[in-house]
């Protein structure tokens, strides 16, 4: 079956209808790593950059954080706002190609899950996330592993109305692009993790078997100097 490619915003607006119910091995891998990297957030100010349907937003809000969440997809934001854990979250519509709309040193923790593989201006975004972090802030960042591009994989879903495969536009960043942007933005890279599809992933998401052994996730734990 052929695949259509939509601009990122339009693609995620459409995907929002089924995103949380869509069986996704990348999310299976990513959730475990990001929970570890995000850490204890009780009483902390948290910014969720590109929050989508609020997967991480709802988790950190339920853990006692004061959360601000931003995304440029109104469809995704509507889904996030509807989650009961997110009733006290501040949601903003914002395009990440623009300067973040917050003063310097606003947040204790910054979360950015499966977003920046759609961003070509990496140095600018990493720099902005560093700017709005307080001294000593930490960040948890994840992307689809660039190795997936060798298999022709990108963020995509099956439209429930038509059965068509729809992909959301990506920036095709290399590992070196991410690492260079981190190093030039003032963050300290405390940890970098790569995760491949393993037996546990396949058990939770059987369709992942065709990617067995392939790196699917890359994630970073970053720190800002105190």
Regions found by a protein language model. Name each.
Residues 188-226:
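Conserved Class I S-adenosyl-L-methionine
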Residues 123-138:
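A short glycine-rich, Lys/Arg-flanked "PGG" loop and its adjoining helix->strand segment in the class I
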């Amino acid at each position: 079956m052929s695949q259509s490619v939509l601009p990122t915003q339009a693609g995620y607006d459409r995907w929002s209808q089924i995103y949380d119910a869509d069986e996704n091995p990348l999310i299976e891998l990513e959730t475990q790593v990001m929970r570890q990297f995000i850490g204890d957030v009780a009483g902390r100010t948290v910014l969720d950059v590109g929050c989508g349907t609020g997967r991480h937003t709802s988790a950190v809000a339920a853990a006692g954080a004061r959360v601000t969440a931003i995304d440029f997809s109104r469809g995704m934001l509507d889904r996030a706002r509807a989650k009961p854990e997110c009733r006290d979250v501040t949601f903003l519509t914002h395009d990440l190609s623009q300067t973040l709309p917050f003063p310097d040193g606003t947040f204790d923790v910054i979360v950015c899950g499966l977003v920046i593989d759609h961003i070509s201006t990496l140095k600018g975004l990493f720099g902005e996330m560093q700017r709005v972090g307080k001294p000593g802030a930490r960040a948890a960042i994840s992307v689809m592993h660039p190795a997936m591009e060798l298999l022709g994989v990108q963020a995509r879903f099956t439209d429930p109305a038509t059965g068509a495969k729809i992909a959301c536009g990506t920036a095709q960043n290399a590992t070196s692009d991410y690492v260079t942007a981190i190093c030039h933005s003032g963050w300290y890279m405390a940890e970098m993790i790569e995760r491949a599809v393993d037996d546990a992933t396949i058990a939770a998401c059987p369709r992942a078997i065709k990617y067995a052994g392939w790196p699917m996730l890359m994630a970073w734990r970053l720190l800002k100097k105190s």
